[in-house]
Amino acid sequence: MSLKAIKYSNGKLEILDQLLLPAQSKYIDVKGVEDGWKAINKMQVRGAPAIAIVGCLSLAVEIFGEKFDTKQTFKQEVEGKLNYLVSARPTAVNMKLAAEDLISLANALAQDESISVDTMKERFLKAIEDMLDKDIADNMAIGKNGADIILSHIPNGGSVRILTHCNTGSLATAGYGTALGVIRKLHEMNRLEHVYCTETRPYNQGARLTAYELVHDKLPATLILDNMVASLFKSRRVAAVVVGADRVAANGDTANKIGTYQIGVVAKYHDVPFYVAAPFTSIDLKIPSGDRIVIEERPDREMTHVGEHRIAAPGIACWNPAFDVTTADLITGIITEKGVFKPAELKEKVEQIISTNQKL
């Protein structure tokens, strides 16, 4: 059984504090929007899908026991709090899109004269709570689509070695995972020979979180340093790279954890297929290309210290972007729950899917 990083029931939310992993597994209460904002901003929860789910559930917790006099009051309160949650980590598009969807729902419910404010709140809460189940189902579809596309290039039923970066598993989603979901599916199919995960400096999500999940699930795995990827590709047969995404632009450029871009460059040189695994909601057609994606910069201390111990010379300047952009020309395919798309066809395919859904 994979890890459960988010626990929610009847207006009560607990999250696994990822800052304490792997030394300590501790769940913390999220009692409202302010707690949700802080947990996202401090990276007690991280991963674009999990950020959206925890952010929205923190709003559910806050309004669960609250009484509202009018539908307009309800709409104004949830809209303001959703916009505030988006500001916690703006690079991840999932929270922004979830906020937009919920604000649209609140507007529609407010205009429906046939329902009361209590019914409006009930339907709004159900929409948030349904996100948990939908995310897990979407992740399992991503896992299957990814495993199928990777194995389609492997003759005679052979097993594969996979490289992944950062953390994209149960700790980054409601469960199962995106890129790590692909790896889990390969393992379930008895087609995974080995997985390599990078340490993912400076926050070490690979060493602390992905390695933790891989050990927990008993997957055959090896941790490598970030600067060993080229040597790995040169010395061992790696079938594919599979990474996650915080935002995918309309042209296929992809923002993901810092270090992803250099893996893409090295994979291209060594002819290793490079896949991005992400929910459909991570694709942002409003962003034409990666150079328009706002990249969050993190505090110097994350580079200069490990825990309380300084490892860098005092006085040295630091540059600490949380993400980089892997250009579309380096990406073999973008794996979603709705299919696998080549970057060149992404915009057209996504528009077709959106248009079809709007007609249903």
Swiss-Prot record:
Its EC number is 5.3.1.23. The record marks C166 as: Transition state stabilizer. Its main location: cytoplasm. InterPro entries: IF-2B-related, IF-M1Pi, IF_2B-like_C, Initiation_fac_2B_a/b/d, M1Pi_N, NagB/RpiA_transferase-like. It catalyses: 5-(methylsulfanyl)-alpha-D-ribose 1-phosphate = 5-(methylsulfanyl)-D-ribulose 1-phosphate. One of its GO terms (molecular function) is S-methyl-5-thioribose-1-phosphate isomerase activity. It is found in: Cytoplasm; Nucleus. The keyword Nucleus applies. It is an enzyme of class 5 (isomerase). GO terms for cellular component: cytoplasm; nucleus. GO terms for biological process: L-methionine salvage from methylthioadenosine. Pathway: Amino-acid biosynthesis; L-methionine biosynthesis via salvage pathway; L-methionine from S-methyl-5-thio-alpha-D-ribose 1-phosphate: step 1/6. Keywords: Amino-acid biosynthesis, Cytoplasm, Isomerase, Methionine biosynthesis, Nucleus. This is Methylthioribose-1-phosphate isomerase. It comes from Aedes aegypti (Yellowfever mosquito). The lineage of its organism: Eukaryota, Metazoa, Ecdysozoa, Arthropoda, Hexapoda.
